[in-house]
């Protein structure tokens, strides 16, 4: 296995939970990228100094134009590159830039923050990592994202259950449309069904985030991705994740990036078995 910044404990966390957190770029670069976004948002009437303009607009082309900026293409740490080497092998495909933009402004909705309900909020990229880690999704922070501040929700441990589900599908079920297979997955276990059907609970946060629940022998729990400018969560692409509401007092600025093992190269990615053997 390639050496790098991820320790045995880090690799164990990635195997068990489906994520590991480190630094994607410097705090200074993150602050500079956030400033670029504010400058671009001014063209849509959104002003940093005027909270009354902080509305969740459909800013067509904003992400694409911002990603052409030098910082968005070049600002990355050796730590992140080396960590991806450890997880995917050195033959992963380098992207042209380091991710699409995710942004949301504080809501005026009086409802308290809670875990997303509808199954259409929850999604995953299941087929890449059934036998080994071939794809990652990286969620990085341009601004500070606090709890209940719009950070992505992730079901830690769910990549194991996703792999189990797809490995058990018959050829006939595999041939079904992706939407059908996804709907069947959310009926695969009572906990998943409860998470994604909007069943009324006094506090969904307590139910799904406080303590792990055993699902087919794997501890599953919803975690909220929060962090400081420049930090990144590297996640298994098969882990179930969802959007969440921003009930904080500040905007959320993040980037999301999929990284993939080059299928034309010899497969040097970590198998699920080799990840277990590092622990």
Q: Which residues fall in each region the model found?
A:
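A short secondary-structure junction signal
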Residues: 113-115, 120, 148-157, 163-168, ...
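A structural signal for short, well-ordered beta-strand segments and their strand-loop junctions
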Residues: 21-24, 93-98, 137, 151-154, ...
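Short, conserved beta-strand element in jelly-roll/cupin
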Residues: 123, 127-147, 226-229, 258-261
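Non-heme Fe(II)/2-oxoglutarate
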Residues: 46-49, 164-170, 178-185, 189-197, ...
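Extracellular structured ligand-interaction cores
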Residues: 17-19, 133-139, 149, 222-224, ...
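A generic fold-level signal
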Residues: 14, 96, 133-134, 147, ...
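Short, solvent-exposed loop/turn segments at secondary-structure junctions
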Residues: 26-28, 103, 144-147, 159-160, ...
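Non-heme Fe(II)-dependent double-stranded beta-helix
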Residues: 2-16, 22-129, 270
């Amino acid at each position: 296995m390639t050496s790098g910044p991820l320790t045995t404990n880090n690799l164990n966390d990635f195997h068990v939970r489906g994520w590991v957190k480190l630094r994607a770029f410097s705090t200074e670069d993150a602050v500079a990228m956030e400033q670029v976004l504010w400058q671009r948002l001014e063209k849509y009437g959104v002003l940093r100094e005027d909270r009354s303009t902080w509305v969740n607009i459909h800013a067509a082309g904003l992400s694409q134009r911002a990603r052409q900026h030098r910082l968005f293409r070049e600002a990355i740490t050796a730590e992140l590159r080396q960590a991806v080497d450890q997880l995917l092998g050195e033959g992963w495909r380098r992207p042209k830039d380091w991710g699409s933009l995710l942004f949301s402004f504080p809501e005026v909705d009086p409802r308290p923050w809670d875990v997303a309900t509808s199954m259409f909020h929850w999604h995953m990229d299941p087929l890449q990592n059934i036998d080994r880690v071939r794809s990652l999704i990286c969620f990085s922070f341009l601004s500070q994202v606090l709890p209940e501040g719009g950070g992505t929700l992730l079901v830690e441990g769910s990549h194991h259950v996703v792999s189990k589900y797809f490995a058990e599908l018959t050829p006939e079920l595999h041939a079904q449309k992706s939407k059908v297979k996804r709907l069947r997955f959310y009926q695969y276990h009572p906990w998943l069904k409860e998470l994604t059907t909007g069943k009324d609970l006094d506090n969904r946060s307590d139910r799904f985030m406080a303590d792990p629940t055993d699902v087919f022998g794997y501890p599953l729990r919803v975690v909220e991705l929060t962090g400081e400018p420049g930090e990144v969560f590297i996640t298994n692409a098969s882990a179930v994740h969802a959007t969440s509401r921003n009930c904080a007092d500040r905007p959320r600025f993040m980037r999301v990036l999929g990284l993939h093992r080059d299928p034309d190269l010899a497969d040097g990615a970590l198998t699920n078995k080799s990840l277990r053997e590092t622990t």
